[in-house]
Amino acid sequence: VDRSENIRSKSMRIVRDAFMFSCFTGLSYVDLLGLRSENIRHIDGHLWIVSRRTKTGTPVNIRLFGIAAGILSAYMHNNTGECIFSLPSNGICNKYIGIIMHEIGIFKHITFHSARHTFATTVALSNGMSIEVISSLLGHKSISTTQIYATVDRGIVAESMERLSENIDSLYSQIDSRRKKSLIRVF
């Protein structure tokens, strides 16, 4: 994002920030468009988005951290009922995102919806979040919808196998030697 400092217009900067916010929250364009200050709550010392998906009506509760919290603080207004992000149409947002991506040397076709995929895969899944939790955060009614996002990469498989190995080794080390011998004979 640092390389995009020459972004020309205020509108383009808002789109960039909203896109990044979506990368760290999983909110869709339409849900971000309707995000208001009353959807932001302080719960247990943390900021949360408490809302409902526009598309499905399912409840969504997303804890804000790091980059997303920083972006929110730059756009949060005290006026209740006011949208946090004043965004142009989805088509204009996608056009701006394309321009921004080219300016920073990314030449793939990226749309606002790509941010939602980024959250599901790069942010959540690759950091060990379960598919069930991701499904809830994305506001999906069915896990099968979430599985579209869940491309499993080798790193995740390797980390999961490592955790499994450590757990089994830990359990095995707690068994006395006599029981270990009987377990080995079974196999």
For the regions a language model picked out, list residue spans one by one.
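Conserved tyrosine-mediated DNA breakage-rejoining catalytic core shared by Y-recombinases
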Residues: 1, 25, 34-71
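Basic, Lys/Arg- and aromatic-enriched nucleic-acid-binding interface segment
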Residues: 1-29, 78
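Short, contiguous acidic/charged loop-to-helix segments that flank catalytic cores in large enzymes
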Residues: 6-11, 51-61, 82-89, 107-114
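Catalytic-site neighborhood detector that most strongly recognizes the C-terminal catalytic loop/helix
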Residues: 53-57, 90, 138-163
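C-terminal catalytic core of Y-nucleophile DNA break-rejoin enzymes
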Residues: 54-73, 79-99
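C-terminal secondary-structure termini that scaffold catalytic or DNA-interacting sites
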Residues: 164-187
